[in-house]
Amino acid sequence: MAKVKTKAIFKSYNQQQALLLPPTLDELISANHLVRVVNQVVDEMDITPLIEQYQGGGTSSYHPRMLLKVLLYGYSVKVYTGRKIARALCQDINFMWLSGMSRPDFRTINGFRSSRAKEVIEDLFKELLLFLMREQYIRMENYFCDGSTFVADGNKHKMVWKKNALRYKEAAEKRCGQLFKEIDELNRQEDKQYGANDLEEKGEQSAITSEAISQQVKSLNQTIITATGKQQKRKAESLIKKLEKESDKINKYDRQIKTADNRSGFNKTDEDATAMLMKNKVEVLPAYNVLGGCEGQFITGVSVHQNTNDATCFAAHLEQVGVQQPKQVEKIIADSIFGTEQNYELLEKKNIGNLMKYPQYHSEQKKKNKENPFIRENFAYDNQSDTYTCPNNQQLILKSTSKQTHKKTGYESTIKIYQCTNCSNCPFYEQCCKSEKGNNRTISINEKLDRYKQQARQNLGTEEGEKLRKSRGTEIESCFGDVKHNMEFRRFHLRGVKKVKTEITIVAMAHNLRKVHLEKIKRLKNAA
């Protein structure tokens, strides 16, 4: 039987329909929307330090609370640039409701972020943490710490390497040395002609400095004035041009070396950015090392560094987050890269619980290491005689004590060297000694570090310590994962370490607001 075709019916559609009572923007936004969380949290924050950034006078300014809301919400929904936020304020009802229909342009938004917010960003972050504590999202007890690299806003093809600057400077100085010899030869020719020997010879004995080059240029100018022959004048003029060219190069390389400082190099676009190896182990890009800490997957501290090594940045990280946090954390849980003597000592001074692994932590737990009598950790130690005993019952006595200084941090460690009295005819020599045949077994002992390791081993071995150690991967790694994957923030949009620090703190605040939103929805579901 053929299907009967009926007339299609459509819902009413009239763009010109006038409403007697037009809906407000508030009615169009759902009760559990993220924008309402941002609005509520910022309304409860004390932004007095931010308001104090405004000197007063002149025309009226957009309210800083509104600008802060717009900026945080923009970062929460992956709108990071000033122009895109300004466009959203005209097109997106969430932005329009949050701003109260205010429409600051992109210059106002960028200026607020890069100047006024930059000066008080730590205070604003602290206010957000206080809100999280009041609402019992965090307690500031445990601090799960780790680092991650973020690409800088710089051209990857415009890297300046310090070693190249040093090499090029050395070559330029050699060329200057050759020019100095030519100047000495020109002076000797002048002396033969005029019989005056009042010009000091530079040549190889002269240090290539800006003052030395200026002095040579001055003498050449004098030669041009006094010389009667055209050939001498042309030669002097040519040498002046060459010297000035090499002088400019040396000054340029000096500036590059000074800018690089203790780094391997810098980026021309963002001079504070450092070349760092990305996670794929292939690309080397201008980047910053971001160290962060969290509790309950809420970011409770964040800092920016120009060094790729997390361990050497840890002391600076604690100093920076100390300003951001309303109270000091009780325990720090971190991966083995952080387990250095300097960092352990820092935790002890600050009276913070030590749950940081060290590089050999997992290998020590293996059966083959526990049962290996030839590793120095398994040698018996006699405290009274200050000696170690090897598997062949031979004593290792203290041979020397030395100081070792860390190249980058300057931290000094005390190392004790113990040596066996007699390893000749030892049946375990091949298994015990890794050095050349005939040398007695020596071991290096850092008593202070060993004490800190034992402390970490005991803390991590408890039921609570084991639970916290296992939670580290799901805590801070989840925060970085949310920022990089869900928020798609892998590259900074500002330049300079201070502005970059401001931006990553805004990102951390946006992450926390997103997390509050999810927790509120979860609580509503559990209450239903």
PLM regions and their residue ranges:
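Hydrophobic alpha-helical membrane-insertion signals
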Residues: 1-36
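Conserved catalytic-core motifs characterized by acidic clusters
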Residues: 99
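Anion-binding and metal-coordination hotspots
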Residues: 2, 6, 12, 71, ...
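A generic alpha-helix surface/boundary motif
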Residues: 19, 67-68, 126
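Basic, short loop/linker segments at the boundary and entry of helix-turn-helix/winged-helix-like folds
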Residues: 30-72
